[in-house]
Structures are given as C-alpha cells and as structure tokens.
Amino acid sequence: MKSKISEYTEKEFLEFVKDIYTNNKKKFPTEESHIQAVLEFKKLTEHPSGSDLLYYPNENREDSPAGVVKEVKEWRASKGLPGFKAG
C-alpha cells in the first residue's frame, strides 16, 4: 500500500474507497483486513472525521465513494495539504 494520499491518483483512491465501501472480499478477505483498510483510509486522508466519512456522511454530501473522495479532496485543498498525484 501507498503511504501518502499524494501517491494515489484520484481514480486509484476512488477504487480503494469503493473496495472499503463494498467490503470487497477479494481485496479484504477477512474482517481484520477490512479494519486495516479503514485505518489506512483514516491515516491517508488525515481528515478530522476519519472513518465517519465512510459511515456517517454529512447531509450536504452524496453518500457514495465518489462523495467521500470529493469531500476529502476539497478538505485537503482547503487546508493546503497535498492532493492526488496527476494521472
């Protein structure tokens, strides 16, 4: 796994979020591996809401993987944090 969000393209990160959202058993065959992916999401995004972005979306956001990625992208930009790599 990549260690920084800036190592992901937006498309790659969206796929990662989709896999978490759907609990993709090919990517995360065990509950523990799924939990580790959620923890990795929290670490990568650095967002104060952490995994709540996945499970408890705010009312102003689309409840989907794309909505999660959009919120992360906008929040990181507003804080001057690096975004996704070009690609």
Swiss-Prot record:
Keywords: Bacteriocin immunity. GO terms for molecular function: toxic substance binding. It holds the Pfam family Colicin_Pyocin. The keyword Amino-acid biosynthesis does not apply. The keyword Transit peptide does not apply. GO terms for biological process: bacteriocin immunity. It comes from the Bacteria. InterPro entries: Colicin_E_sf, Colicin_pyocin. Belongs to the colicins ColE2/ColE8/ColE9 and pyocins S1/S2 family. This is Pyocin-S2 immunity protein. It comes from Pseudomonas aeruginosa (strain ATCC 15692 / DSM 22644 / CIP 104116 / JCM 14847 / LMG 12228 / 1C / PRS 101 / PAO1). The lineage of its organism: Bacteria, Pseudomonadati, Pseudomonadota, Gammaproteobacteria, Pseudomonadales. The gene is imm2.
